[in-house]
């Protein structure tokens, strides 16, 4: 008979509690997308529910027809195809039927039709976080991509040798905004990484400020400079020098008139240069009201000096001409373009993660449901770029895991589905216009082929949908926890440089530094570490033990993301600690 053998562990790390569920993120991601087991009225606005709410209602161009979404249901397929093992044997896809309750309102005939429309089949996830597609078991690998939000960085202009400071507002969907300085110390805004406009033109175009005077009030202090005593105290070149130090580079706040002739000595908003100073001295003005430009505000003042637009109408037309050169422009069409670009949630979406990142980086508390650009976002970004120019603040490391997030299968599929639904909605609008509206039904309006083709393509031949490695149970588990920087919306192996592939200190406890393929994909494909978890925003967290007064409390374990561990002293997991928790 064999005796029970006592096992000894020679590892430095003692048992630190239960390991997390290894497939929790993958399963939750798809469950959140489908919300199959949730009653329609209790569903959260995410996944399929969010897509339907965004696409519907669909209205005809004349406003007579309106197709509304009520709810959706997912039904099991008939036996035997409702069983994953049977699907494997028969070479079929393990899926459910997506049925959507729609309401068509005909305002001309006052007729309302409510129907449950079959949208097609949607693959279901097995308990092991896999999909059975045409009899083969497949895994959708999670994607590591650049997080929406805000980043600040510094680049060297090789021609001038000067540092260029850039603040980027990156939305989840929509137009990128880059606030960058140039060789002349002017702050510009680059729209969608292509067209560059002056900061002050942009601020007026988006209606954050109406005029240059409003911009000056927003960024500069109004100050009355007393001059009478200077004329008595200083003379000649010395007086010129003092006036230049006090006034040059600022802006006149109010029109200055010659009381005898009624002529302008200087106009409001005029830059105070040598000529204006000469006029002030000649007329022996007792005081001058100015907008004082401090050294840190010089980049704003330089933008104003080069800005030829006076009102927001002129500014919005200039932005339109930069974005759509050659197109016929009116104030209304230009306003519509800018509004669609930054303030329409269907075109510009920061998502909850983007809003969270912006709030955290700029120390704001804008509600998370505000997913479009706000005046506060832009002004705080400008302030931070000013800080960087003046040697304050810090730039971001784009390879830090606080600036990279994981997209699970649910999020990846929702991007595909949204594309299919948009195509479908365009076809519905065309049918509403062309066909006889008295004979139309929800079924006849909808063509779900583009949607089904995209879903099939995603699971069948998508770059992140892979045939599961089944050589042993460990290989299977590793494949499901794999994270790839490749795929749609990610990096390409040809363009990815050394920095993005390299091991980063923020990977500690989050991504395995060893397990990565050799060859062209090195560093672009990795695996979640044993204790690594993905939080609701998609950032990878790892557990930490709190140390207070030199004592470790293993009952107080906190999961922190890479952004939350900044500014804290961190010791390695294998640091020697005695039985009482002392270092």
Regions found by a protein language model. Give the residues of each.
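Hydrophobic beta-strand positions
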Residues: 256, 513-514
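N-terminal non-catalytic structural scaffold regions of very large proteins
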Residues: 1-484, 529-583
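Flexible, glycine/threonine-enriched loop-and-boundary segments that flank and lead into catalytic domains
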Residues: 113, 482-513
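Active-site proximal loops enriched in glycine and acidic residues that flank catalytic Cys/His/Asp
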Residues: 515, 526-529
């Amino acid at each position: 008979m064999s005796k029970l053998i006592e096992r000894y562990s020679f590892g430095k790390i003692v048992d630190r509690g239960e390991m997390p569920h290894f497939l929790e993120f993958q399963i939750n991601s798809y469950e959140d997308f489908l919300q199959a087991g949730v009653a329609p009225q209790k569903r959260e606005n995410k996944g399929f529910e969010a897509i339907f709410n965004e696409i519907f209602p669909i209205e005809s161009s004349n406003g007579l027809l309106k197709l509304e979404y009520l709810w959706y249901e997912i039904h099991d397929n008939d036996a035997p195809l409702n069983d994953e093992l049977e699907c494997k044997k028969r070479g079929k896809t393990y899926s459910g039927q997506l049925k959507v309750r729609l309401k068509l309102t005909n305002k001309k005939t006052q007729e309302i039709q409510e129907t449950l429309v079959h949208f097609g089949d949607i693959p279901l996830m097995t308990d092991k976080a896999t999909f059975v597609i045409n009899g083969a078991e497949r895994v959708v690998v999670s994607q590591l991509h650049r997080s929406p939000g805000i980043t600040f960085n510094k680049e060297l202009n090789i021609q001038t040798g000067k540092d260029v400071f850039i603040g980027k507002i990156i939305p989840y969907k929509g137009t990128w905004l880059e606030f960058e300085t140039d060789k002349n110390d002017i702050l510009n805004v680059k729209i969608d990484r292509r067209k560059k406009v002056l900061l002050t033109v942009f601020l007026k175009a988006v209606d954050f400020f109406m005029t240059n005077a409003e911009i000056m009030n927003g960024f500069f202090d109004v100050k009355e400079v007393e001059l009478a005593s200077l004329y008595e105290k200083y003379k000649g070149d010395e007086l010129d020098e003092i006036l230049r130090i006090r006034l040059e580079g600022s802006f006149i706040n109010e029109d200055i008139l010659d009381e005898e002739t009624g002529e302008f000595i200087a106009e409001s908003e005029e830059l105070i240069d040598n000529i204006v100073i000469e006029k002030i001295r000649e007329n022996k003005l007792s005081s001058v009201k100015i907008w004082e430009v401090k050294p840190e505000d010089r980049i704003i003042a330089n933008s104003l000096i080069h800005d030829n637009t006076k009102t927001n109408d002129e500014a919005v037309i200039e932005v339109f001409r930069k974005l759509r050169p050659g197109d016929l422009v009116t104030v209304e069409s230009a306003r519509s373009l800018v509004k669609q670009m930054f303030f329409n949630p269907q075109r510009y979406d920061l998502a909850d993660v983007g809003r969270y990142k912006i709030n955290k980086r700029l120390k704001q508390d804008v509600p998370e449901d505000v997913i479009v650009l706000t005046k506060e976002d832009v002004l705080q970004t400008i302030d931070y770029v000013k800080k960087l120019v003046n040697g304050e603040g810090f730039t971001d490391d784009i390879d830090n895991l606080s600036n990279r997030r994981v997209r699970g299968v649910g999020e990846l599929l929702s991007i595909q589905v949204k594309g299919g639904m948009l195509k479908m909605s365009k076809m519905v609008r065309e049918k509403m216009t062309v066909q006889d509206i008295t004979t139309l039904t929800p079924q006849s309006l909808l063509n779900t082929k583009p949607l089904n083709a995209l879903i099939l393509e995603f699971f069948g031949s998508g770059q992140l949908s892979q045939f599961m490695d089944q050589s042993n149970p460990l290989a299977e588990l590793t494949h499901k926890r794999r994270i790839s920087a490749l795929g749609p919306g990610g990096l390409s192996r040809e363009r990815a440089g050394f920095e993005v592939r390299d091991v980063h200190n923020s990977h500690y406890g989050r991504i395995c530094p060893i397990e990565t393929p050799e060859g062209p994909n090195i560093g672009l494909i990795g695996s979640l570490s044993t204790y690594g978890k993905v939080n609701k925003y998609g950032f990878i967290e790892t557990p930490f033990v709190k140390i207070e007064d030199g004592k470790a409390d293993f009952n107080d374990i906190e999961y922190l993301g890479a952004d939350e561990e900044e500014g804290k002293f961190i010791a390695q997991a294998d640091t020697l600690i005695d039985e009482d928790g002392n270092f």
